[in-house]
């Protein structure tokens, strides 16, 4: 069965390592338009709750686009206009984990998603 990009989303998962800092993203699957998806990012090698965290993405053939930011304590969140009202960023400092809940997915959300520390 073949799927076109206009019908499904494929969010590829990459593992990023820089020095001792490790950020491992997971949760990418094929999702129907209008569907939902939750991405996770497990952090290690630094004091997670000392840093604000970001999600960024890269659509095929495009540059990096900032998606969302959450403060160190989760008290403040910020979103790109393109995802506002559809995406929710959260974190669990006890688990050194960052999350991105993505609802009402659109074709233009098709991208590689990365977590990043401030």
From Swiss-Prot:
Task: Name one cellular component (GO) term.
Answer: plasma membrane
Query: Which keywords accompany this UniProt record?
Result: Adaptive immunity, Cell membrane, Disulfide bond, Immunity, Immunoglobulin, Immunoglobulin domain, Membrane, Secreted, Signal
Per the record, which residues fall in region Framework-1? Answer: 20-44
Residue ranges, annotated region (Framework-2):
53-69
Question: Principal place where this protein is found?
Answer: secreted
User: Which residues are in the Ig-like domain?
Assistant: 20-118
Q: Show the SMART domains listed in the entry.
A: IGv
Disulphide-bridged cysteine pairs: 41-115
PROSITE patterns to which the protein is assigned, alphabetical = IG_LIKE
Q: Where is this region: Complementarity-determining-3?
A: 116-118
Domain of life where this protein originates: Eukaryota
Any single Pfam family the record assigns to this protein: V-set
Where does the record place the region Framework-3?
78-115
Q: Where is this region: Complementarity-determining-2?
A: 70-77
Stated role = V region of the variable domain of immunoglobulin heavy chains that participates in the antigen recognition. Immunoglobulins, also known as antibodies, are membrane-bound or secreted glycoproteins produced by B lymphocytes. In the recognition phase of humoral immunity, the membrane-bound immunoglobulins serve as receptors which, upon binding of a specific antigen, trigger the clonal expansion and differentiation of B lymphocytes into immunoglobulins-secreting plasma cells.
Q: How does it assemble?
A: Immunoglobulins are composed of two identical heavy chains and two identical light chains; disulfide-linked.
Protein name, as recorded: Immunoglobulin heavy variable 3-43D
What organism, scientifically named, is this protein from? Homo sapiens (Human)
The record lists the lineage as: Eukaryota, Metazoa, Chordata, Craniata, Vertebrata
